[in-house]
Amino acid sequence: MADHVQSLAQLENLCKQLYETTDTTTRLQAEKALVEFTNSPDCLSKCQLLLERGSSSYSQLLAATCLTKLVSRTNNPLPLEQRIDIRNYVLNYLATRPKLATFVTQALIQLYARITKLGWFDCQKDDYVFRNAITDVTRFLQDSVEYCIIGVTILSQLTNEINQADTTHPLTKHRKIASSFRDSSLFDIFTLSCNLLKQASGKNLNLNDESQHGLLMQLLKLTHNCLNFDFIGTSTDESSDDLCTVQIPTSWRSAFLDSSTLQLFFDLYHSIPPSFSPLVLSCLVQIASVRRSLFNNAERAKFLSHLVDGVKRILENPQSLSDPNNYHEFCRLLARLKSNYQLGELVKVENYPDVIRLIANFTVTSLQHWEFAPNSVHYLLSLWQRLAASVPYVKATEPHMLETYTPEVTKAYITSRLESVHIILRDGLEDPLEDTGLVQQQLDQLSTIGRCEYEKTCALLVQLFDQSAQSYQELLQSASASPMDIAVQEGRLTWLVYIIGAVIGGRVSFASTDEQDAMDGELVCRVLQLMNLTDSRLAQAGNEKLELAMLSFFEQFRKIYIGDQVQKSSKLYRRLSEVLGLNDETMVLSVFIGKVITNLKYWGRCEPITSKTLQLLNDLSIGYSSVRKLVKLSAVQFMLNNHTSEHFSFLGINNQSNLTDMRCRTTFYTALGRLLMVDLGEDEDQYEQFMLPLTAAFEAVAQMFSTNSFNEQEAKRTLVGLVRDLRGIAFAFNAKTSFMMLFEWIYPSYMPILQRAIELWYHDPACTTPVLKLMAELVHNRSQRLQFDVSSPNGILLFRETSKMITMYGNRILTLGEVPKDQVYALKLKGISICFSMLKAALSGSYVNFGVFRLYGDDALENALQTFIKLLLSIPHSDLLDYPKLSQSYYSLLEVLTQDHMNFIASLEPHVIMYILSSISEGLTALDTMVCTGCCSCLDHIVTYLFKQLSRSTKKRTTPLNRESDCFLHIMQQHPAMIQQMLSTVLNIIIFEDCRNQWSMSRPLLGLILLNEKYFSDLRNSIVNSQPPEKQQAMHLCFENLMEGIERNLLTKNRDRFTQNLSAFRREVNDSMKNSTYGVNSNDMMS
C-alpha cells in the first residue's frame, strides 16, 4: 500500500513538472518518465488510483489520456469486460464529480467516446454493449444544468469522434462504424438536440448565467456536429467549401419538411447574443445545403421560401453582422443559396425582388469596406459568379433582375480596389496584391460577373483606365511629381490591368458577340499602349506588381485570342489593326515575344517576373500553329542563336542566388527546344550550333573536375544550371530524330561528369535532384523516342549508366545516418523517389532486353534492383504513404517489377518479401486512387505468379520448379496471414466502401480466393451470419452468385466472368444491406 502511495506521489510530481515547469530539461525528463509509465504493465491500475486519489487536475488528465491510449492500441487490445468496466467507471466518475476542471472533463469524455467507437461492434450475450449512448446520458440530461452540459458534451464528442477517421485503424472499419452509427443513433441525437434547443429558447434563457450560457453553446456544437457528419463517406477534403452538399438520409426527411426546424435556428439567431450566432449560422449553412433529392419540387420550393425569408430578415436587421465571425458565416449561407438551388427556383420565391436588392446592397457595402474580412468576400463573389453564369440558361418567366444589380457589384469591386491604393500606400497597410492567390481567385469570380452586362463593365473600365493613364503620363512628364503620386497611379493601373485581363479571360465563345469582341479590342489597345510606356522607362525604373499584372493579362489574352481555335475574323483584331497597326496574330505574337525578351533583359534577377515570363513563353510554344508562326519571328531566331548569360542575365552563375532559383531555366529550354524542333529535322549542324553554350559549360565543368582543387560553388552552379537546361531540352525533344542527336551528344562524352557530380555531392539535394531528374528524363521513352537500331547496343549502354547512377547515389545516400524527421524528405526521400521513377522508366521503356544481362554475366540489372531493395528497406512503411510523390514512384515501380521481374521478387529474403507485401496491404486502403490501383495490379501479378507455381508444383513435370519459385512458395505457405489479410481487405472495400476502382480490385480477388478457399469460406460464413436472420439467405445467395460459373484457373475468360459477377454481387449486397444497421462481427473483416 505504501508503495502505491509513494508511486502516486511520484506520478503527481511528474505531472506537475510536465504541465507547470518552465525548464525545458525538466519537462523533457518528466515526459520521458510518463511515456515509460504509459507503457508499463500496471498502467491501468495506476490510472484508476490517480483518478480515485490524485490531488491535482493534472494527474487526472494524465490518467484519462493514458487510458485513452490503452483502449486505442491495436496490438494486445484490452479485453471486452475491462473496456465495459472503464466505460461504466468514467460515466460514474463524471456523474459524481461535476466540479472537475474543464480539461479533465473533456479528456474523460474523449475516453468514453473512443471506447464507444472502437467497441461499436462488440457483443455480449447478443447485445451491442457500446451502443447505448443516449441511455448513458439520460441521467445527466435530467439533472441540473451542469450535468446537462456534461451529457450534451458526451453526445457531441461521440458524434465528432465517430465522424473522424484515424490512421491507426483501417478506413474500412471507420466507415462501417460511421454508417452503423448514422443509421442507428444519429437522427435520435439530432432530434434530441433540436428538442433541447427548443426548450432552451422557449424558457427565455438567462444568458448572464454562465452555466446556461455553456449549455446553449454545447447544444449548438452538438447540432452542428450532427449536421456536419460525413453521411456517405465522401468528405475526405475538409479544406474545400465549394459545392458542398449535405447528404442527409431519407429517414431524416420529416425534420426538414417541418418548417419549425429551420425557423428554430433563425429565431435563435435573433434572440441570442452575437457571440453565439456564428454557430447558429453554421447550422443554417448545413441545413441550406441538404441534398436536392431529399425533396420533391413542391417541397423544395416551400423549403427555399422559408430559407429566403430567414435570410431577408437577417439582412433587414444586420446589427449582428458587424461581428466578423457572424459576417463570415452569413456570407457562406448566402453562397449556398445558389450552389444548392437554381436561379429558376430562386426567382419564383415570393420575396425574391426584395431579397436580391438587399443582397446586392449588402455585397456593395462589403466590397466598399475592402479592408474588412477579405476571406468572406470570396463567398459573396461566388454567389454573384454563379448567378451571372446562370443567366443564359434561366427559363423562368419571372424577372431575375441581375441586369440591374450585377453591374453594381462589378462597379463596387473595381472602384473599391482602386480607392484602396492611396490608403494602403499612405498608411503603410498590407497590400492585397501581395496575396496573388487571393487576388487570382477573386479575379476568376469577377471574370464571370463582369461579362454580365458587359457594355457597362467595359465603359467603366475604359473611363477609369483613361483617367489613371492620363494622370500617370502627366506625372511622368512633370519634374516636380512626387514618388507617392506616381506609386498611386501605378497601383491603380495594376488593378485595372489585372481586371481587364480577367474580364477578357471570362469570354465564353457561344455567348459572346462581335460587339463584345470589339470592346475587348478597346481594352487590349489600352493595356498594350501602357506597356509601351512602361517598357520605355525600364532602364530608369520599373514596377514589379504592374509587370506581374501585365503577364496575367497576356496569359488571359493568349488563352482566348491566340491559338488554333480562334476565329481570325474577330472584331478584336480589327480594332488592334486600326489603333496599333497589329494586323494579324503573327504581329500580336511579335509583341508577346518582344515583351518576353524585354522582361528577361531587365527583370532577369526578379524570380517572380522571370518565372511567369518564361511560363508565358512555354505556353506559346505548345500551340501547333502559334509555334510555327513564332519560329519565323526574328526575335525568336535571336533567342535560338543567343541563349547566353550575356543576353539573358538569369542564365548567369550569380553567386548571390540559391541553386533552387535556377528552376526556371528548365522552362526556358523546354520552350527553346520546341521552337528549335520545328525546323530542325536531321540538321546536325544546326543542332550543334544551338548546343554550343551548353557544350562550353560541360567542358568548363570537366576542366574543373580534372584538377585537384577547384571552386566548388562555381562548379555546382555551372553544373546545376546546365542539367536544368538539358532537362528542358530533353523534355521538348519527343521525336526520335532530335532525341537521338541529344543522346549522341551527351553519351558517352559527358555522362561521366554527371556520375562524378553524384559521387561528389550526393549529400546536397540542391545538386543531386537536378542531376537525377535529368537522368530520369533521358531514360523516359516518351512518344517512343528511344528506338535504337537493331545493331545498336545503346539501349543496354543507357541502362548501364542508369544502374551506375542509381547504385552510386543509393549506396552513398544510405551512409547519411540518422536524418531529422523534418528534413528527411528533402535530404533523402526526394532523391530516392526520383531514383525509383528513373528505374521504373528504364524497366518499362521497351528498349532493353533485360534477359541478356544474366546471360552475359552483366551485373547492371542486379545492382540496380539490389540498390532498390536497400533503399526501400531504409524507409519506414508510414513514409511510403505519407509522401505522395514517393508513394507514386514506389508503387508504379513495384507494379513493373511484379509484372516483368517476379523471379527477382521471389528470390528475395523472407523479411523483404513480407515488407513488400505489407506495403501493398497498406496501399490497398490509401486515399490516393493511383496508389490503390497500383497495389491491386501488384497484388494481381504476385497472386497469379503464386497460383501458377502452385499449379506446376502439383503436376508431375520433368522440369522441377526453380529455387526462387520454390522458396517463394514456401514463404507464402509459412505466412498465410498476410495474403488472407489482403483478401479480407479487398472484399471489405468492395462490400462496404464507395469503391472507385472496382475493376482493379476485382483482378487480384479471384486469385486470392483460389489460393485461400477455406479462409474465404469462413469469411463468407462470418459475413452471412452477421446479417439479421431475415437477410442471411439473401446474402448467402449473393456469394453463391459471385462464384457462379467460375473455374479454378486464372485464364482471361474466367477472370472476365468473375469481374462481371463481382459487379452484380456488389449491387445485390448493397441492396441487401441498405436497410440493415447490423455489421460484420468479424475480427478478420474489421482488422
From Swiss-Prot:
GO terms for biological process: intracellular protein transport; nucleocytoplasmic transport. GO terms for molecular function: nuclear export signal receptor activity; small GTPase binding. Pfam families: IBN_N (PF03810). The modification N-acetylalanine is found at residue 2. Keywords: Acetylation, Cytoplasm, Nucleus, Phosphoprotein, Protein transport, Transport. It is found in: Cytoplasm; Nucleus. Disulfide bonds: none annotated. GO terms for cellular component: cytoplasm; nucleus. Binds to nucleoporins. Found in a complex with XPO7, EIF4A1, ARHGAP1, VPS26A, VPS29, VPS35 and SFN. Interacts with ARHGAP1 and SFN. Interacts with Ran and cargo proteins in a GTP-dependent manner. Belongs to the exportin family. This is Exportin-7. It comes from Mus musculus (Mouse).
